[in-house]
């Protein structure tokens, strides 16, 4: 799609390039619940990073692609690295909610 691939970080897309993908992608906000409640991006499902990494098979299907989002892109990059290593198809949403200027905020 619009993501670019970098060997060291895997698939990455800038948060401000996802507006036209909202509703068509599996978007997961890995921030803590209190952070998520303060605002996220429409259709993002909240699964805190600790829970997701503890039991990824509980939340993710290896046959689907997931876009992983956090506040700045740092946590999502770490999570994507671990999830990719486990065989999941993930895209890091760089910049995170903190950099998002699109119209799909909730």
How would you describe each model-predicted region?
Residues 1-16, 21-25, 33-65, 74-106:
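Rhodanese-like catalytic fold shared by cysteine-dependent sulfurtransferases
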Residues 69:
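Short, surface-exposed ligand- or partner-binding patches at beta-edge/loop junctions that are enriched
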């Amino acid at each position: 799609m619009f993501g670019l691939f970098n060997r060291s970080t895997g698939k990455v897309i800038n948060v401000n390039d996802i507006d036209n993908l909202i509703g068509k992608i599996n978007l997961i906000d890995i921030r803590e619940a209190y952070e998520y409640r303060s605002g996220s991006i429409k259709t993002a499902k909240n699964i805190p990073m600790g829970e997701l990494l503890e039991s990824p098979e509980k939340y993710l299907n290896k046959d689907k692609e997931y876009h992983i989002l956090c506040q700045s892109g740092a946590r999502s990059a770490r999570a994507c690295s671990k999830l990719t290593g486990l065989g999941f198809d993930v895209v890091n949403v760089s910049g995170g909610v903190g950099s998002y200027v699109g119209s799909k905020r909730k």
